[in-house]
């Protein structure tokens, strides 16, 4: 199934003269996760359908979703990286486009533009937060330290996280500081990865799929813009999720969502990086918080409705908590007409993008310097 959907994605890009798709979804582990979740959602919508028709519908919709989603992030990725030659292929592609657009609108409509995090210089002793490693270490110590203190030493020993007789304080410090170290390693390695990937993809984009770019894991964005945006996005996304979880408890929701690290971190950190690039610090704090709320409420609704809550979990990433529940409603209540509507919607996305910027649409991937010159003239 993943292979068929991937080939369909490639065909759509190969026919870009008509389809207007420009990016290929290359994040393999994400493709497998999404195929598993899509299978359940489509089976829920068409329980009496045979294996082959379900697989065909899945391949069609996933191939279109991968092509449309990665295509949505082309311009914002090129803008963030100054033409590095990739787009984002992950679980929050529609969210990245939406929040980037909202960030830009918010910054333009405000009386005073919000500075980007990388442009801010804190005064006095606060200047230590200008260094990403220090800022992340302190913030994570406060954040995770508070959680670990609430859990308590006895619980950590019982759960075998902490050995008997070991220092509880030292465990908190090393756990929090390790997070900062691992994040720094991830950010440092990203630029090397991007350089190698774009170089290896050049042959394909020049010979076989002219002007196409690879859609890659969202973590590649962490090597661009402000490193502190990653930490800010994680913290405010977590606050949004915790608030939403509290609301579910107060409202006695039949489905209770527990915050998972991957949706909290990778969705909201990535949203913050792109939001900061378009709208500065305010956007980097606001939109991950809103995203956290949407992740929890959306996941609770869809997981409870389709029955996945009974099996212990759901892929609570942004697109699958917000966009795919809408697709599922259309397919459930409109049957094959709903499938057609979803397919038409995904096919229409690049067409609309193209109509909004005919001159620059393909130029942004083929010659970014010329694209910037074109935009400067307007």
Language model feature labels by segment:
Residues 2-196, 208-217, 307-378:
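Signature of multi-pass transmembrane helix bundles
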Residues 14-22, 218-304:
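Hydrophobic alpha-helical bundle architecture
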């Amino acid at each position: 199934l993943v292979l068929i959907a991937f080939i369909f994605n490639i065909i759509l890009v190969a026919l870009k003269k008509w389809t207007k798709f420009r990016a290929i979804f290359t994040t393999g582990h994400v493709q497998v996760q999404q195929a598993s979740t899509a299978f359940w959602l489509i089976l829920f919508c068409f329980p009496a359908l045979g294996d082959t028709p379900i697989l065909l519908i899945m391949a069609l919709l996933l191939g279109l979703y991968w092509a449309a989603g990665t295509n949505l992030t082309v311009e914002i990725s090129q803008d963030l990286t100054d033409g590095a030659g990739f787009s984002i292929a992950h679980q929050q592609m529609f969210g990245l486009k939406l929040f980037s657009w909202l960030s830009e609108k918010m910054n333009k409509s405000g009386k005073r533009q919000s500075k980007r995090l990388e442009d801010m210089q804190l005064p006095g002793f606060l200047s230590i937060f200008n260094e990403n490693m220090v800022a992340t270490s302190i913030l994570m110590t406060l954040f995770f330290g508070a959680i670990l203190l609430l859990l308590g030493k006895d619980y950590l020993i019982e759960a075998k996280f902490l050995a008997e007789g070991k220092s509880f304080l030292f465990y908190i410090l090393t756990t929090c500081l390790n997070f900062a170290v691992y994040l720094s390693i991830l950010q440092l390695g990203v630029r090397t990865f991007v350089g190698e990937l774009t170089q290896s993809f050049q042959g394909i984009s020049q010979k076989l799929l002219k002007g196409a770019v690879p859609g890659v894991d969202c973590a590649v964005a962490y090597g661009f813009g402000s490193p502190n945006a990653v930490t800010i996005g994680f913290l405010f996304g977590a606050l949004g999720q915790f608030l939403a979880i509290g609301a579910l408890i107060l409202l006695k929701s039949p489905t209770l969502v527990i915050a998972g690290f991957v949706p909290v971190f990778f969705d909201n950190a990535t949203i913050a990086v792109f939001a900061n690039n378009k709208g500065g610090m305010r956007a980097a704090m606001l939109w991950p918080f809103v995203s956290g709320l949407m992740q929890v409420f959306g996941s609770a609704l869809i997981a409870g409705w389709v029955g996945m809550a009974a099996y212990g979990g759901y892929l609570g990433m942004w697109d699958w908590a917000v966009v795919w529940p809408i697709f599922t409603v259309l397919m459930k209540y409109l049957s094959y007409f709903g499938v057609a509507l979803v397919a038409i919607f995904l096919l229409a996305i690049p067409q609309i993008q193209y109509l909004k910027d005919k001159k620059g649409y393909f130029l942004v991937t083929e010659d970014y310097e010329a694209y910037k010159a074109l935009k400067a003239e307007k």
